[in-house]
């Protein structure tokens, strides 16, 4: 049983890695062309997303600004925001690294924020982080509060990820202890090769530990935020925080496509609410759809409840929660893979565009 489960996890991890790689079939490209044409035909008025301060999009685990300098992490999102009047920058941090510490993603993001401010003449930025990018954004808001106007987190594991716990437990079964270092070495190379800048600052084991529920609790103690609810409550916190006299607007949303179903002999089933059963094209065109359904099922059986395949609803709650009802998996949240998503999934590009307008109306 344990061996079978581990095999499934390995298969799911391989599928996830493959899904992130820069490739697309002809059918997927045709679908994307149609989608972009429809978006252009219904585009809001110019200036709709013109926020007062620049927006910085912050990628999560395994990310970069453009994979191998070609495939955007935030697929089609930066362009859409720019077309609607926003000033948008995309951070390029270590794909595999912790958020704190001198080599951490937080310090990397802080340096990038200062670069953007120097280039634009702005005094603050709006940080929008996906997955681990939300934790990196919180770091900057904590250590340099005067540089931040708002923090928005999308599918961020503020309480850690049950799947990260699971992977850590599986690696602990190895009596030699070699598997962790060997796998980490391969993952680090993957991070270097896929980074647009071939960033060598990669530490897969540190990244894994950062995303566990235990380490997340420590991170929250070291970098507290009013946007967090009480530990274990599955509640969000305040919609704003004031740090050193600087007020930050705090927002979050998340996908919860993976929902628990019936339990049989102690094993809980799951369903992907984003797709048509069996026949949805996303199951074929986007390998991450089935992979994240598998990882989400593992999470449910570790008590996570509804999730996006990597982050639970409860873990994603932060600040003013705009929605936890999107029928998205973890990659749908950033319009991946290549804009392909399940038949019932909402348009993430439109959601982020609307949020930029929300920030504009809030005066930031």
UniProtKB/Swiss-Prot annotation:
Function: Catalyzes the hydrolysis of triacylglycerol. It shows a preference for triacylglycerols with a chain length between 6 and 12 carbons.
Complex and partners: Monomer.
Keyword Calcium: yes
Active site: 131 (nucleophile), 308 (charge relay system), 330 (charge relay system)
Location within or outside the cell: Secreted
Positions bound to Ca(2+): 286, 332, 336, 340
Disulphide-bonded residues: 234-314
Cofactor (UniProt): Ca(2+)
AB hydrolase-1 domain mapped to chain residues: 54-266
EC category: hydrolase
Keywords: Calcium, Disulfide bond, Hydrolase, Lipid degradation, Lipid metabolism, Metal-binding, Secreted, Signal
Catalytic activity: a triacylglycerol + H2O = a diacylglycerol + a fatty acid + H(+)
Protein name: Triacylglycerol lipase
Listed GO CC annotations: extracellular region
Gene Ontology biological-process entries: lipid catabolic process
Signal sequence annotation: 1-44
Major localization listed first in the record, in broad terms: secreted
Encoding gene, per UniProt annotation: lip
Pfam families: Abhydrolase_1
InterPro entries: AB_hydrolase_1 (IPR000073), AB_hydrolase_fold (IPR029058)
Binding site for substrate: 61, 132
UniProt EC number: 3.1.1.3
């Amino acid at each position: 049983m344990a061996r079978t489960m581990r095999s499934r996890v390995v298969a799911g991890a391989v599928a996830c890695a493959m899904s992130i790689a820069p490739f697309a079939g002809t059918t997927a490209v045709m679908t994307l062309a149609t989608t972009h044409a429809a978006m252009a035909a219904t585009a809001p008025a110019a200036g709709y997303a013109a926020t007062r301060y620049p927006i910085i999009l912050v990628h999560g685990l395994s990310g970069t600004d453009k994979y191998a300098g070609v495939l955007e992490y935030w697929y089609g999102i930066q362009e859409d925001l720019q077309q609607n009047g926003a000033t948008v920058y995309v951070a390029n941090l270590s794909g595999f690294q912790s958020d704190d510490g001198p080599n951490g993603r937080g310090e990397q993001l802080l340096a990038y924020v200062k670069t953007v401010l120097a280039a634009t003449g702005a005094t603050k930025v709006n940080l929008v982080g996906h997955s681990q990018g939300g934790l990196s954004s919180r770091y900057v808001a904590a250590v340099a509060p005067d540089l931040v106007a708002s923090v928005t987190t999308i599918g961020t594991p503020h309480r850690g990820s049950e799947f990260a716990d699971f992977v850590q437990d599986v690696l602990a079964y190895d009596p030699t202890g070699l598997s962790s270092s060997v796998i980490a070495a391969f993952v680090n190379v993957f991070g270097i090769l896929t980074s647009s800048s071939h960033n060598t600052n990669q530490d897969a084991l540190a990244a894994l530990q950062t995303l566990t529920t235990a380490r997340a609790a420590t991170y929250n103690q070291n970098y507290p935020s009013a946007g967090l609810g009480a530990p274990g409550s599955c509640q969000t916190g305040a919609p704003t925080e004031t740090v050193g006299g600087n007020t930050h607007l705090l927002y979050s949303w998340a996908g919860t496509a993976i929902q628990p179903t019936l339990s049989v002999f102690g094993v809980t089933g799951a369903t992907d609410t984003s797709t048509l059963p069996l026949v949805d094209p996303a199951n074929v065109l986007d390998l991450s759809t089935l992979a994240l359904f598998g990882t989400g099922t593992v999470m449910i059986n570790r008590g996570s409840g509804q999730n996006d395949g990597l982050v639970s609803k409860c873990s994603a709650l932060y600040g003013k929660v705009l929605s936890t009802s999107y029928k998205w998996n973890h990659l749908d949240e950033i319009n991946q893979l290549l804009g392909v998503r399940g038949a019932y999934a909402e348009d993430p590009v439109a959601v982020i565009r609307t949020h930029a307008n929300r920030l504009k109306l809030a005066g930031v």
